[in-house]
Structures are given as structure tokens and as C-alpha cells.
């Protein structure tokens, strides 16, 4: 469960507005006053704010990298046309970017894939971290897409952006064909950053949507300095020291966000655990039904095999009784035989569990990243008393039914 919870949320509590959690663009999210109120009414061991840079900003990246982004949405012909309209500097192209600024306390939430984030904690730094997309198993599928640690990259901040008609230099109109659209930046200025690290930015504290270009991380002081104070609070997150503080915070936030028109929403590890419990319950229900069906079929087959074995040997049993075997001896023999079949079935089930269990666990682990296989003999142990009981009762019932007839009648029926 904790593997699932840690993936779904990186903190005990994340608070913002409904627009943030519903992926709606907004000019304002959670306010500093709301953050202060929450901080004053909760006990936290770690807390901080994530900021969105609400200003046009672009990052200069290689054309090959930008082509990888657009190739997901455009044909080769459209892509070539698009690239020809974009602003170039040598082999670099001006691409979109998403810059998120973090309080220094939140850098502990980043998973460093390569490099070191400590330069971002220094005052007046020009360090930037590139957020990479790792797969469910922590691997970087396309390392060539990202800049290298130590590279210098240029970001262009602008006060405003307009689309113009590249033929006339005037603002575009409704009649302007798309192939002549061109961005024009007003009040643009460049800032050079040094890539200090490639990091995984947890989804739960990111913008929560993708796009074209790199997603980057700056310290809040650097972002405010370079954007002219355009970094606004986007989310507030905090961890609690113990379960009691977590329960108190959960109760407080549930009251604070109650109501359909509440200006705030929150996510917590408690909600993630509840989601996992429902997900797990679905697997238990479906798996339990399938196991019950398979188990019932297995028991019926076991019952049928034993019953058929006894009925097919009625003549043999009658002959044994005719030559002197007592009813008690015959019944005891059948019981031991039934118990032998029962324990043989359990032994085969145990061997199959040892052989098939790890293979099935590996297969499920490749399908569900949060799945961890753990071998258990409990299901096999639970079948032992059931099979022993069947191995004891079936011979007794079948023999008692046959013993109602004399040996002569049994021989005649067997013929």
C-alpha cells in the first residue's frame, strides 16, 4: 500500500483550489493568507509552497528535442512547416516551458536522477533543474531528449506575447492562414541558467499537466527575481510528525473544504489509502470469486475421482470380503487410501504453488508497478483439513452404502 500511496502523493497533505486539482488554468490559486491560516491550525514537520510562474517564458532547446515533442501531435509535413515559423538561434529553437518555483524546504521532495540540487539553495543562484519523466520503475526512457548536467541554457521572459502575420508584421486577423502565424514578444529579456540536476518532480506537486517543452524547477527567490515577481502560490503541502497530528489535520481540512462551493480542496495520504483499499477490494472480490469457482471444481473432481475409484472396484472389494477380509479392515483400507489421495493432492498443489507462484508474481509485477509478490503457503494449508475431511468421509459413506448388501449381492451387482 505504501508504495502506491507514495507514488500518488508526495506529502501527507496538499492544499490548493479546485482549479488546480481539476487542471483548469487560473490567474490565482491558493493565497498567502489561506496558507497562513492553514499553517496556524495544523502541526507540521515539513511544509512549503509551490509556485507557478504567471508570465510568458520560453526555453531555448535543440530542434531535435522540440521535434520529439511536436511529433506526437503533428505529421512530418506539419512539423516541418511549424519549425520553419519558429524563432531560431543557430541550432537552438525557442520552445515553450513550464517553470515551477519551490520553497527551499520542498527540494527534499525531489528525486535527483543526475547532478546535485544544492546550488539551487544558494542565494543569488542561476541554477536550474530539469524535471524528467521516469517510467513506473524509475528508468529514464529517453535521456537524449534532455540537456546534460552542467549545460548552460537560456530562458526568455516576456511581458506579453502577440501573434502577428509574418507577411505584414501586423497583428494577425481571423483571415490570417495558420502557416503565417508568428509569435512576437514584448519586453523580452534573456536569463542564462546552468543545469545543476535532472530531477523527478512528483506529479502531485507539479502543474499536473504536460505540454511542449521542458518542465523546469527554480528556487522561489530566483524565480521571483527573474520573472519580476510573477511567481504566485500554486499549492501548499505539509507533512505531520505522527498519526495524531495527521488525524487532527485531516479533520481540520475536511471542515475547511466542506461544501460544494468551498474555495479550497485538498489531497491527503488518507484519501490515497482509501483509493487503494477500494482498488484492492475489487481484486479481492474478483479473485475470490474466481478462486471459489476453481476450488469448487477441484473439490468436485476430487470427490468424483474417489467415488469412481471405489465404485469401479466393488467386485474387488466383494472378493476380498469373500476370502476373509473383515468390514473393519476394508473400511480402514479405504480410509487410508482416501487420506493418501488427499495428501497427494495437497503435495501437488504445494509444488505447483512453488513453481507457478513466482512466475505469476513476476507477470503481475510487470502489469502493476505497485504490486510486490510474496509467497505464502496459507491457501495450501487451508485446503489440508478440507481434503482430509473428504478423504475420510467419502470412503466411509461409500462403504456404508455398499455394506447394506451381502457379499453375494455385491458380487452379483458387480457382474
Ranges and model annotations:
Residues 1-2, 347:
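Short, strongly hydrophobic transmembrane alpha-helices
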Residues 2-287:
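Basic-flanked hydrophobic alpha-helices used for secretion and membrane insertion
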Residues 6-12, 408-415:
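Short, highly charged, low-complexity non-transmembrane loops/tails of multi-pass membrane proteins
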Residues 195, 236-238, 253, 276, ...:
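Hydrophobic, well-ordered secondary-structure elements that form the walls
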Residues 273-283, 329-333, 342-409:
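Short helix-loop junctions at transmembrane helix boundaries
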Residues 298-341:
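Interfacial "coupling" helices/loops that link adjacent transmembrane helices in transporter permeases
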